A protein has these predicted regions:
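A sensor for short, sequence-defined functional sites
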Residues: 1-186
Length: 190
């Protein structure tokens, strides 16, 4: 019996940020963690010595400076946690160009598959679903020279999907990132 889809394991995040002429990015993120993501956040939060240590770890992982941090449902028995944070991040500036990764908060910062040998199928502990919407406002007088291309990827069986859509409307860059991963990665049969 497959029990992997009993609960919803999801992160839904909205990021609103402003890029300043000096390359400073300021903004806020509102994220809802559900299921195993909420359990993992609780585990990491309580493993830290205090909230300051947790925030310091978050700043290091995300390469940001947290200005304000708040959670809801962290201390209750609930399948979800809501996290609010105000942040600052420095983009790379070269002369009058500002280089920005529109994915301010990365879904994956390093590959989890680091073993030299792997046996397929790979079994993941739970189904993952990440949805992140980012709205970046560029500084007045600046123009976007190049945007990454939209990307849609999926496995042959359609079980794992990554969608990365990016567009510009006026001085706002909109990024929608969706990743859905199920619990098995199988070897391709020829």
């Amino acid at each position: 019996m497959n029990l992997s889809k009993l609960g919803k394991n999801q992160i839904r995040a909205t990021v609103r940020a402003q890029i300043h002429p000096d390359g400073q990015i300021t903004g806020d993120r509102n994220a809802v963690y559900m299921g195993q993501y909420a359990a993992n956040l609780r585990r990491r939060y309580y493993a830290a010595k205090d909230s300051t240590e947790y925030i310091n770890q978050l700043e290091t992982e995300e390469n940001i400076k947290v200005k304000k941090f708040e959670t809801r449902e962290l201390n209750v028995f609930s399948p979800r946690i809501t996290e609010f944070l105000d942040f600052e991040k420095q983009a790379t500036v070269n002369d009058d160009l500002i280089y920005v990764n529109p994915m301010i908060f990365l879904h994956v910062s390093k590959c989890p598959f680091i073993q030299t040998e792997r046996q397929l199928p790979l079994e993941m502990p739970y189904t993952e679903h990440i949805l992140q919407a980012t709205m970046l406002t560029i500084p007045e007088g600046y123009a976007v020279e190049e945007l990454p291309k939209p990307l849609n990827l999926k496995t042959e069986d359609g079980q794992d999907i990554v969608r990365y859509n990016i567009s510009q409307s006026g001085n706002t860059i909109n990024v929608t990132y969706t990743s859905v991963s199920y619990t098995h990665l199988r070897a391709h049969e020829t």
